[in-house]
Amino acid sequence: MAGSKSPKGEFAGRKLLLKRRASRWHHYKYVNKALSLKLKADPLEGAPMGRGIVVEKVGLEAKQPNSAIRKCVRVQLIKNGRQVTAFAPGNHAINFIDEHDEVVIEGIGGPSGQAKGDIPGVRYKVVMVGKNSIRELVRGRQEKVKR
């Protein structure tokens, strides 16, 4: 008859505690939290939004079973120089964004900070172009400021 690996008894508390503490490191979520890996990998460095310069416009194909070209932009962040892809939400929103424009991006709202819906690998969306909200530009309530 095989015995239990766990110590039993009146004075086994410390041993159980140490064993549990060591076992936690086998769980990926604990490791990520303990070493704050999410913050280190995050291009926005924990901030809710970030400013950046548009490097280029890109069209990404939607994942199956959808068939579309999702309009996105490559943005170089000002704070650390990292490049990320951001989705341009709204009808013809890409027409209001030009290369070398300053944009503000935020998370797209996918599950646990990941991509949302059928847009592969895109974790961010454009919120503002220059001083104007992208939503207001699309609706026609604001006009883009000409330099």
Swiss-Prot record:
GO terms for biological process: translation. It comes from Methanococcus maripaludis (strain C7 / ATCC BAA-1331). GO terms for cellular component: small ribosomal subunit. Signal peptide: none annotated. With S4 and S5 plays an important role in translational accuracy. Located at the interface of the 30S and 50S subunits. Pfam families: Ribosom_S12_S23 (PF00164). Belongs to the universal ribosomal protein uS12 family. It comes from the Archaea. Part of the 30S ribosomal subunit. Keywords: Ribonucleoprotein, Ribosomal protein, RNA-binding, rRNA-binding. This is Small ribosomal subunit protein uS12. One of its GO terms (molecular function) is structural constituent of ribosome. CDD domains: Ribosomal_S23. Coiled coil: none annotated.
